[in-house]
Amino acid sequence: MKAVIQRVKNASVAVNGETVGKCGEGLMVLFGAETNDTPEDAALLAKKTAALRIFCDENGKMNRSVCDINGEMLVISQFTLCADVKKGNRPSFTGAMEPTAANKLYMLYCEELRKNGIKSVETGIFGADMQVSLINDGPVTILFDTDIWRKNGNQSNTLRTD
């Protein structure tokens, strides 16, 4: 599972010119599910996202989470995060999870964010052609990849989230 997490002043997503999701100060997340991803990965990713301390405290240090600042989130599905470009110039998406299963993990991730204290979690429309607008704050952009966490010997239930 891959997630590109961006600290934003605000973000919105539109389909056919109509805004379908938006957030104020907080995080905008691009979410991609891969073939080997599990519900446990979605839960861990949500826990890590909610606890990620990338907002500045009174001393200017990145020491606060989106929960700490009562921030909002916009989560957008993006299967192209799972692209493989090792061979040739055209990306292969065979590593992306099939849409029905990926949508379930996407929705689970959003629900787990709420369970982890995020009060406002809005989304795009899964599988739609979307136009995304945002003001990236910093910029601060973090990449999460649960496959790398697994390969480094970290198990989902033992990764630190503090």
Across the structure, where does each feature detected by a protein language model lie?
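RNA/tRNA-interacting regions in translation and RNA-turnover enzymes
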Residues: 11
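A short beta-strand-loop-alpha-helix capping motif that often carries His-Thr
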Residues: 63-80, 126-137
